Amino acid sequence: MFPYPTLNYSPMAPVNPMAYRDPNPPRRRWRPFRPPLAAQIEDLRRSIANLTFKQRAPNPPAGPPAKRKKPAPKPKPAAPKKKRQPPPAKKQKRKQKPGKRQRMCMKLESDKTFPILLNGQVNGYACVVGGRVFKPLHVEGKIDNEQLAAIKLKKASIYDLEYGDVPQCMKSDTLQYTSEKPPGFYNWHHGAVQYENNRFTVPRGVGGKGDSGRPILDNRGRVVAIVLGGANEGSRTALSVVTWNQKGVTVKDTPEGSEPWSLTTVMCVLANITFPCDQPPCMPCCYEKNPHETLTMLEQNYDSQAYDQLLEAAVKCNSRRTRRDLETHFTQYKLARPYIADCSNCGHGRCDSPIAIEDVRGNAHAGYIRIQTSAMFGLKSDGVDLAYMSFMNGKTLKAIKIEHLYARTSAPCSLVSYHGYYLLAQCPPGDTVTVGFQDGANKHMCTIAHKVEFRPVGREKYRHPPAHGVELPCNKYTHKRADQGHYVEMHQPGLVADHSLLSLSSTKVKITVPSGSQVKYYCKCPDVQEGTTSGDHTTTCTDLKQCRAYLIDNKKWVFNSGKLPRGEGETFKGKLHVPFVPVTSKCTATLAPEPLVEHKHRSLILHLHPEHPTLLTTRALGNDARPTRQWVDQPTTVNFTVTGEGFEYTWGNHPPKRVWAQESGEGNPHGWPHEVVIYYYNRYPMTTIVGLCTCAAIIMVSCITSVWLLCRTRNLCITPYRLAPNAQVPILLAVLCCVKPTRADDTLQVLNYLWNNNQNFFWMQTLIPLAALIVCMRMLRCLLCCGPAFLLVCGALGAAAYEHTAVMPNKVGIPYKALVERPGYAPVHLQIQLVTTKIIPSANLEYITCKYKTKVPSPVVKCCGATQCTSKQHPDYQCQVFAGVYPFMWGGAYCFCDTENTQMSEAYIERAEECSVDQAKAYKVHTGTVQAVVNITYGSVSWRSADVYVNGETPAKIGDAKLTIGPLSSAWTPFDSKVVVYGHEVYNYDFPEYGTGKAGSFGDLQSRTLTSNDLYANTNLKLQRPQPGVVHTPYTQAPSGFERWKKDRGAPLNDIAPFGCTIALDPLRAENCAVGNIPLSIDIPDAAFTRISETPTVSDLECKITECTYASDFGGIATVAYKASKAGNCPIHSPSGIAVIKENDVTLADSGSFTFHFSTASIHPAFKMQICTSVVTCKGDCKPPKDHIVDYPAQHTETFTSAVSATAWSWLKVLVGSTSAFIVLGLIATAVVALVLFTHKH
């Protein structure tokens, strides 16, 4: 019946009965037959796979689903569109995938860093480094690890650390520390940390409370530092860290103003109830809802460390989102209001002005000033509006457009920014500052005397900011309105009489109270009636003059000004952040035209063309600095003497330049006589003139003497024979006197006569030919010989010991070279070169001084009564009570009494806001250490930038060698016992001790740090009696001694230090002082030596100097021909010290020649050069260099400089020899005449 075969196995699913089918069904596609058991196993595998990977979502279809997602958000409105794409979500995704280095840092930190828990909250961290666990001392709590929590920790309060040894099982899995900290970027939990100028910094806002104890790692995962805290420094945060030095000793580096970064919650107080400062108890306790209570809460926590958190919580506790960069910085000033204060010059005289000027700060560069007024900017009565300013129009608050505001000095100022009570403007120079505005037909202005100057940056006195130039550090007022750590003191306003609250109602004085306000009244008619009312009140007085009404305003703060009366009773103070605080920035300064430089022999001529007054400073780089300092404002030419020790000049804002003189000269010391004279005349003009005059005088005297002797001798000889007829003239006399003899005895007869009569003259007669022969030989020798060579004595630098000792000059860049010889081994070349040297004294900070600011609180006015002063702990605090002030009715305080009124005036000193960027530090300096960075090469080993201590005791490990250098031959330092550091400059200055500063001089304001409470001040502050018309606190005091010192401080040490020292800071040090010599000792390992049998043996050496310029930087070239036993390398060195060879070794073949360069100061160098174990002598003549002045120091010593060349000596000897011949001839003739005359007489 069914066309299909019967199944031999039970089916997997029941088969439904099938309907009638065509006996010829359609054909189906062929499929491979699957065995039943295999099918069951496959189905089981699929079921297990589905259970295992059920969480894996199926792959979406390729086409339609993707197309459906795109048009889905299109019909939706714009508002939901913003919600679906919040910017923080994208930033969060980026943070989830840190970089490779940060991932490694986070991995190492998570394994070796353990949180410290306090009350279940992470308060800080402890890390395991080098087998020890380190925990910040200021972080309270317990380490979240059972084994580490059980360790007994030792306290090191000087480093703010606790430490202890970790268990043995954990020592193999700890972080390793390193003392290597090259400048660059390092890693920590929050990303990159920048290390520069010996300080770790991060961008501001990165890291904070709770990060104390986290490690800073390098790229190898080694701990470089442990974070303890930080200090905000403008746009970056300086980290307080603990590091390790090269000896493994812990070093703490804490920047000024740093705070510990533990997460301990700071508590605030309100009505004897403590609460977290970021969570006020009346949450949401907003200023809008409870203004008076909020101000009271802030006043009671004025000195709290978390005052900023409390202020932010009180101002921003509402959930309404605020616009970033606008209300974020403006909302806190809604706690304050403008006020009316006294102005000494309102254009028409003294008045109570709505825009009175409280203070002007102009210590920034480029003409920026900050003005504080009694009006407010960027605020209206109903909120924030940058286009408006508000002021007190009588007793009401009024707002107008900010465009009606102006400021001027000698010309209108440019308003840069404004916020709260403050204006930031850029003004031209002037002697007064005026601020005003136009309110309809009314004009309000206030002018005060304040000198505004354009303060240029650097060493050029330009008058306008340049368009381009050089970037230099300067002080500016930041344009930001954000919190910068400076505060302005506020308080609730005092009571001021308001006549508008009083009126007559049925012959009685009625007090009208505004809605929602309170009024305090005081009446005397004749009984005293006083009280406070929140509603209208009618008194028994019948005259308005008998009552005073005061509107109580406790919902707003005002500035704590000396021009406003203080409230009655105990008043608390508040504070708000000051905008536009001074910060360190970069300013563009002018760059004077480069001087035209002219070089002559040992002379430097500068042709200067300044565009404005420009400072020129110079100094010599030797023992006597001979510093000069002059302001050049007109084109001029200056001439300076330059020696081989070096000369430095600094022109304007250009970097300093150093030059050195070379032994140059015109002519040729080895040429003809006129060339020799020209050469020495250019180098030694006076000596050459004296020498030439002496030679000329000798020649003239010799010639005259010889001629006179010869003439006199001839006359003496001939005269007797002329007088005697038929006299016989001897043959010799006839020959000498050109006389033709008629008859003469022969020679034998004459000699016989002398022998018998006078034997002395016989021997004299015999010696005459010998003398003539000697004179002829001497003249011949002077004509043909070049003169004797110079004898140069120098010490050998070779050493024959395993431990090599020597002495090298303390000059940076001048290498010390030697061949270290050891018996049985080939010589090893040794080279030590100083890269930098540092003289680091022990500096103890005595105090910090800066410009002071006189704080004048609101005075206390007591009507019809007396008040008294109370002592307060403020620097230079002055308090005085003045009686009989503000007479009846019309006085500034509106008192009833005539003479019984009193005022308590107060004033004291505090640091100015500029102290954060403009201060001087007074240090006491003691004997310090000397450090050096050296490059060492011995054999084939080369070591770069090795740090060593120059004390003769501390060895430095240089590979397998051990180097000990020092101490210096001269215990010298450029620092006096007292130095002052101002900015990047250092001054030797005898400052007064702490607590002994005098008014008007350096040290009139002293403190240990910029934030400490040990402030000392002596400013000769004196309070004066107030005038009756207005409420104010007059005073007098001495000008700032710090500002006076800045004007008269003179030249910094960097411009006058001898020996070419460069003064640097952080730490205080003198670098590269070329003073004294440095002994050294180095132990070279055996592996650096090679057996002498393994090195080539050199023979048949011949050295020839092909070209030589003496006193120049490797200006000599010589060629050495050789024969070697085998090919190889040989060190070369000149042990004589006359020449310094540039090359250290040469590669030798079996035979050939090689060329080397050398530097020498000798005109006739004759030095020995050692090649392996063989020695050859190189001789030759050197020419003078063509360049008079160069910008590099000499590479040789000046000890062997020859004063006179051999050629000059030869010409001099020829000259003197020829002159002496004339004298000898004259003497011979005189002797002959005397002999003849004597013989004739006998």
Curated annotation (Swiss-Prot):
It holds the Pfam family Alpha_E3_glycop. Keywords: Capsid protein, Cleavage on pair of basic residues, Disulfide bond, Eukaryotic host gene expression shutoff by virus, Eukaryotic host transcription shutoff by virus, Fusion of virus membrane with host endosomal membrane, Fusion of virus membrane with host membrane, Glycoprotein, Host cell membrane, Host cytoplasm, Host gene expression shutoff by virus, Host membrane, Host nucleus, Host-virus interaction, Hydrolase, Lipoprotein, Membrane, Palmitate, Phosphoprotein, Protease, RNA-binding, Serine protease, T=4 icosahedral capsid protein, Transmembrane, Transmembrane helix, Viral attachment to host cell, Viral penetration into host cytoplasm, Virion, Virus entry into host cell. A lipid is attached at C717, C737, C738 (S-palmitoyl cysteine). Residues 83-113 are annotated as: Binding to the viral RNA. It catalyses: Autocatalytic release of the core protein from the N-terminus of the togavirus structural polyprotein by hydrolysis of a -Trp-|-Ser- bond. Residues 710-744, 1240-1242 are cytoplasmic. A motif (Supraphysiological nuclear export signal) lies at residues 44-51. Residues 325-688, 745-759, 802-1218 are extracellular. The chain crosses the membrane at residues 689-709, 760-780, 781-801, 1219-1239. Structural polyprotein: As soon as the capsid protein has been autocleaved, an internal uncleaved signal peptide directs the remaining polyprotein to the endoplasmic reticulum. Residues 112-261 form the Peptidase S3 domain. Residues 262-273 are annotated as: Functions as an uncleaved signal peptide for the precursor of protein E3/E2. Residues 885-902 are annotated as: E1 fusion peptide loop. Residues 1-36 are annotated as: Necessary for nucleocapsid assembly and virus assembly. One of its GO terms (biological process) is symbiont-mediated suppression of host gene expression. The modification Phosphothreonine is found at T113. The record marks W261, S262, R324, D325, A744, D745, A801, Y802 as: Cleavage. The record marks Y186, N219 as: Involved in dimerization of the capsid protein. Its EC number is 3.4.21.90. Disulfide bonds join C850-C915, C863-C895, C864-C897, C869-C879, C1061-C1073, C1103-C1178, C1108-C1182, C1130-C1172. The modification Phosphoserine is found at S110. Structural polyprotein: Specific enzymatic cleavages in vivo yield mature proteins. Capsid protein is auto-cleaved during polyprotein translation, unmasking a signal peptide at the N-terminus of the precursor of E3/E2. The remaining polyprotein is then targeted to the host endoplasmic reticulum, where host signal peptidase cleaves it into pE2, 6K and E1 proteins. pE2 is further processed to mature E3 and E2 by host furin in trans-Golgi vesicle. Residues 98-112 are annotated as: Ribosome-binding. This is Structural polyprotein. Residues 37-70 are annotated as: Host transcription inhibition. A motif (Nuclear localization signal) lies at residues 67-70.
